[in-house]
Amino acid sequence: MSKNKHELGSPFTVPLLLNTLDVPAFAVDADGAVVAWDDQIAALLETAPEDAIGVTDIGERLNDDGSRALANKVADTPIDAHHEYDGVGLADESYALLTGDYVYEDTTVAGNTDLWFIATPVYHTGEFRGVIEIVQDRSSSARYQSELQALFGELVDTLDAYDAGRFDATVDIAAEDTLLDDEYIQIGRNLTEFGDTLAAHITEVHNDVERLEAASQAVSESSAEIDELSTAQSTNVSTVATEVETLSATVQEIASTADEVVDTSATAERLADDGSAAASDAADMMADVATAADSVTSDVEALQNRIEDIDEVVDVITGIAEQTNMLALNASIEAARAGEEGEGFAVVAEEVKALAEDAQSNAGHIESLVSEIQRDTADTVTDLVTTTDRIEDAVAQVEDAMASFEEIVTAVEATAEGIEQVSDATNEQAASAEEIAAMVDETADLADDITTAVADIVSQTEAQSAMLHDLDESVSELHDQ
């Protein structure tokens, strides 16, 4: 047994001993049952001694999470508790109120409370008799003050390093074995993270500034080009405006001409209708002439037939005259034979002969006239046939002319309709051209405004580029300090 081991005497002396320490404390026996519960621990944990004495699971009774008390863990393994249980460590005796070969601390609550739980095993005549556990205020302990002062020193050194531009500096502290509150430890961590973040931001800002400078230069060059293009565009728009005005005037002139063409087309359509009507009348008249020619031809043919009948009658008369002449000759011959008795008969025969000769002569003359009439009639028939053919050709030509007139009328009507549509479209185009001219004028004004705005952008871009250059130099100086 080490001489530093606490020797626990009669259990009846333990409460008196704990009350003399003037710190919250309690003791458990070797079985883990509470054998002493001083007034300070009773007030701190709001648990009267009579409610705690004899309890073997005091931690499970008092802790919200049901965890065991440090004294019970040490009672299980007095000389090896820091190896058996997570969250149990050896306390630094230079800051702890208890001393001994084994002074344990509960590290699981070190960062969550201002209380410091410390326990040490107690022996009597070399035999393990129990454990004393005290609750120490960490904020008033020398260790706490030392760790807090060390943390403040780390914070100041780190801030000085940041001020010098060394953003890789960190706050070094053993967070896993300290009495400091988690809030203090988090301050150190936050400062280290701030340094890392600030270094990253400075690098990023430096890179961004370089990119912005390059982009600003590109924007400046592009703005200058845009300025030139805007000026050229403004000039072009002005030219277009002039050309559109000319176009508008031309379209209006075309619209006026189209209106005149519409009137002319209407006149042509009317004349074509009149021509078609006249051709129709001519066709009717030619048809009447053709009918009349056919009638004349028929009459001439009938006359020719009658003349042929007359010719036959003349032939008969000529025959009769010849026979009469023969009879008169025979009568003269007989009268000559008869002598004086036949002289009267001879005279009659001579008269008959003369009459027959006259009849025969007249019949010949008639026959000659009939022949001439037949020739004239034949010529007339031929001429009438030719005339009829020509009339038929003329009728056909007139009918063709009527068909052509009808086609002309249809074409003129279609042309008139198309020209009316063209006139309407041209009038609409004239109105549209006027609107376009107005819009182009507005565009020209906008182009002038854009040119002015681009010039302002160029000026602002140059100023921004200068500001970015100054910012880059400032960031570089901050990084190089």
Swiss-Prot record:
This is Halobacterial transducer protein 9. The keyword Kinase does not apply. Gene3D superfamilies: Methyl-accepting chemotaxis protein. CDD domains: MCP_signal (cd11386). One of its GO terms (molecular function) is transmembrane signaling receptor activity. Potentially involved in chemo- or phototactic signal transduction. Belongs to the methyl-accepting chemotaxis (MCP) protein family.
